[in-house]
Amino acid sequence: MAKTMMQDRLINPLEGAADAPDANIRPALLAEYIGQPVVREQMEVFIQAARARDEALDHTLIFGPPGLGKTTLANIIAREMGGNLRSTSGPVLERAGDLAAMLTNLEAGDVLFIDEIHRLSPVIEEILYPAMEDFQLDIMIGEGPAARSIKLDLPPFTLVAATTRAGLLTSPLRDRFGIVQRLEFYNIADLTTIVSRAARLMRVPMSEDGAVEIARRARGTPRIANRLLRRVRDYAQVRGDGSINGAIAGSALDMLAVDRRGLDHLDRRYIEILHERFDGGPAGVEAVAAAMAEDRGTLEDVIEPYLIQQGYVLRTARGRVLTQMAIDQML
């Protein structure tokens, strides 16, 4: 039941089936990419330089909390480099043959996107090393004493990998990425621009204060902002005249129990448990997860990043600690 609650959570930053319409409003080029100014400027330079040399872009690792646009950036890289995007994920690549099939189908300049790369098995990693370094694929032919290794040349390609947990990558894999980019939570101004752009593409009339109200409650995350926009659009259609202003957006999000800080019942429950059961901490993440009937990964990837970024919780060597700001504002 807890897992279902997390999946159905409106401000869950993880991608779900309901987010499929977002594909139609994602930026396709760096010029359309909003926010992340450091990442955008660096990628513009790296991509232009690689294109001028007629080379594949260096392998690129993108990490950060979910919902910030790692997949979008991978698509942009492929489009800017003029190559095809081949997508997969760490959990899907179970056998060596799975990765070998993808690598041998690549063409020069293509981008291979591997999401959740921290979940690759050691066997798959070993195949990736020569593919990334030398554009070669080492495969075994035959079995037993007659087995032999052969090398296949691969066309120059770019591996773009995404992860929410960069610390779980092995050093040999991490060191093979020439470009490493960290995506940060978005500020309200950039999210307001993202929401306004999405509303325009969805043909939803919206005022500036309506966009600001949605952005303020979107937890610094574009995926959540777009999801909230769709629900506010529904509310405006039924309870208003179809247009979104600050009052309509505020009423809609209040109805959905997303407060002005972007927090919902699970955030407040986390804070209350840490305060009441663990006296404000320090408390181990496993203990907090057990008290919430959630798994550790869910807390670390979904609930905690925003609470920590906003200054409500500290992650220390001894465990999680509630800050005075959280006590003053929420308890």
UniProtKB/Swiss-Prot annotation:
InterPro entries reported for this sequence: AAA+_ATPase, AAA_lid_4, DNA_helicase_Holl-junc_RuvB, P-loop_NTPase, RuvB-like_N, RuvB_C, WH-like_DNA-bd_sf, WH_DNA-bd_sf
EC number, UniProt record: 3.6.4.-
Protein name as annotated: Holliday junction branch migration complex subunit RuvB
Binding positions (DNA): R296, R315, R320
Key word Metal-binding present: no
Name of the gene this protein is made from: ruvB
Region spans: Large ATPase domain (RuvB-L): 1-186
CDD domains (UniProt xref): AAA
Molecular function via GO: ATP binding; ATP hydrolysis activity; four-way junction DNA binding; four-way junction helicase activity
Chain residue ranges for the region called Small ATPAse domain (RuvB-S): 187-257
Biological source species: Psychrobacter cryohalolentis (strain ATCC BAA-1226 / DSM 17306 / VKM B-2378 / K5)
Family stated for the protein in its record: Belongs to the RuvB family.
